[in-house]
Amino acid sequence: MARVLLIAPTCNGEDVGEAWVAFQWARRLAERHDVTLLTYHKRGARPAAEQLPAMRVIEWCEPPLLGRAERLNSLMKPAYLPFYLHARRWIRQALARGERFDLVHQPVPVAMRYPSPAAGFALPLLIGPVGGSLPSPEGFTTDDTSSPWFTRLRALDRHRLTWDPWLRASFRNADCVLGIADYVKEILAGVPLKDFQVMSETGLDALPERIDRSGRQGPVRLLFVGRLVRTKGVRDLIRALPLVSDLPVELDIVGEGPERAPCEALVASLGLEARVRMHGWQSKEKVGAFYRAADIFTFPSYREPGGNVALEAMGYSLPLIVVDRGGPGSATSDLCAMKLSVSTPEKLASDLAAAIATLAADAGLRDRMGRAAYDHVGKTALWSAKLDRVDTIYADLAGQR
């Protein structure tokens, strides 16, 4: 059992996104290690100390006003600077009064734009899993008209990794950096890293029962699940359907976001109302029903940092069609996914149509790929296996000093 100082500026099992991810890490690590958590208490939310009574929690209240404008706050995290100062001061004072930790682990923020408050102390430091900073492919750079203006600030990430001394020092001083996919190492190529390993930012508790779709009749059901933003490729998926008009395929789109209205307009303009159904946001239980009813999971996101939704789909024994860029390409194998290159919207739509046609026409191939998907996710994405790996990393880091 290691004495772990866990740094997570947001940690809430009743929230979504990174707050939920951090909570999963904290709860599970506390089952194996002696964890002290440094975090923020978001105004109006239940404190982490109440949600995680089995561990020591050091919690500061998020400054007023900084939590407003949810999407902007999610991207820029204006509260991170005061959290950084609080956490760094606490670490300095804790070490001065004789507290001892075997290592520090900072699993969030996932984005590679935030320096760690633990960098530079005489403690082994594990950062990650981190990811993001993927630019859009050149052929798509002028195609996004529905996203808010502030999402373009992501373009600054790579410049900061080149020029920001505090950010560079965090990764340079880390004893190990976990990246959510292989591309992260390429993005960090300009920073000398001591150790780099690939690990997804979250995992699955357990898998549902394997699903046998071999005897199904009726149209082949395609499924997309995710936030509706341009980079998810939903427009391109819709544009692919007229190219397979001779095949009995239908598409269910589960998710909400600024792309919903443009996608609904596109469906109407192409006369696809009978083949495409947009369901908006759905509860986790209902999303599970969509996975079970689907025959093929189609996720053509071309700037997807992680592969969590692909893990979910594989857990439901689904063959996948993904873009071979970022997280989904890394999370899947060639045995369970058709991986597409990406250059322009037109080429992506035609490649999607070709992949859909191949799978729609061959139930045996779908069945084999679905079985391979279930086997693959069982070997790579369960929390139990992930935490076993983390235990090994912790032991290695703690033994270095």
Where are the model-predicted features located?
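Aromatic "clamp/platform" in nucleotide-sugar-dependent glycosyltransferases that forms part
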Residues: 302
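Short hydrophobic beta-strand element within catalytic cores of glycosyltransferases
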Residues: 319-323
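Nucleotide-activated donor-binding/catalytic signature segment of Leloir-type glycosyltransferases, i.e.
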Residues: 262-282
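Short alpha-helical donor nucleotide-sugar binding micro-motif in glycosyltransferases
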Residues: 171, 281-282, 289-294
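A conserved mid-protein helix/loop that constitutes part of the nucleotide-sugar donor-binding site
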Residues: 20, 220-243, 258-264
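Donor nucleotide-sugar binding/catalytic pocket of nucleotide-sugar-dependent glycosyltransferases
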Residues: 56-59, 127, 156-211, 217
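A short, well-ordered alpha-helix in the C-terminal region of glycosyltransferases
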Residues: 272-275, 358, 365-380, 389-392, ...
